[in-house]
Amino acid sequence: MTAMSETRLREDICRFGRSLFERGLTPGSSGNISVKLEGGGWLVTPTNASLGFLDPAKLSRLDNQGRPISGDAPTKEVPLHSAVYDTRGSARAIVHLHSTHSVALSMLPEIDPHAALPPMTAYYLMKCGATALVPYYRPGDPAVADAIKGLAGKYSSVLLANHGPVVAGNTLEAAVFAMEELEETAKLYLLLRGLNPRYLSPEQVADLVKVFGVTLPEHGQA
């Protein structure tokens, strides 16, 4: 990742947050975004803040241990973000939303906790690899950190049951794009549920792994 100034990162958080909000991907004051800083620590959106109306100057700045340094009070989901950063060395940004189709997917009884979505499209695999399902925890529960730490090393995207998706990326743009792909794939799954759709075959998945470097839990880090 090319080094970016803190000012630019603050602007990017607000820009992507507004885009996600305006497209209905996270309603009200739901959802949060964080980005690691080159000099240490990270930025995160404040508690009770709408992603559509963020102020770059009011974003919360935290140290490497997730303790507030400046800005407004941070989101209650700091333990979740900290757990991902502590476990997944490649993560430089995290997006957590309450997007409708991903939340709906997380509530279905048939979902495989190790692969919440089947291999439906090439781009889902290329952007997300695979998605794990985390059992329900109340928002802000510190216990979610332990559950996340057990998965973040293998998965770049997880679904919090009855809550919403969490996606990590090596840039904020990558995390946002992967989040969008996850939400669209969840929508496809719900549209096709019960219709016996044709998924990618094991051979087609293996080809994506070979040609595009797609990484899945059984092949390495996703």
Please give the residue ranges for each predicted region.
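Glycine-rich flexible loops
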Residues: 1-222
